[in-house]
Amino acid sequence: MYLGTGQQTTEALRTCISCGYSWHVVRAPAGTVVRVVASSVVPPSQAPGTVGFPYESRFVLRATGAGFTSLCLEERPPQQGAPPVARYRLRFTVAR
């Protein structure tokens, strides 16, 4: 992803919160290049009581300085010690 210094972007990843799954930052970007400034879970816009998708885990990122970095996320199941079910990697190039 290409950004200019000061620009902001939001990454939204679907997950099944009601099933116990959640996204976690496993490698944060270099803070001098990109920072995670907020994260949240947004519920579905479906009828109340609906189970499963499409909850979204949202990560707000801001470009803080020129350079290259990456963000790595994993979607983990509710079982302690279980391997991740999905991975997401985003590479950043930030210009002045």
Predicted regions located by residue number:
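Extracytoplasmic soluble-region selector
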Residues: 1-96
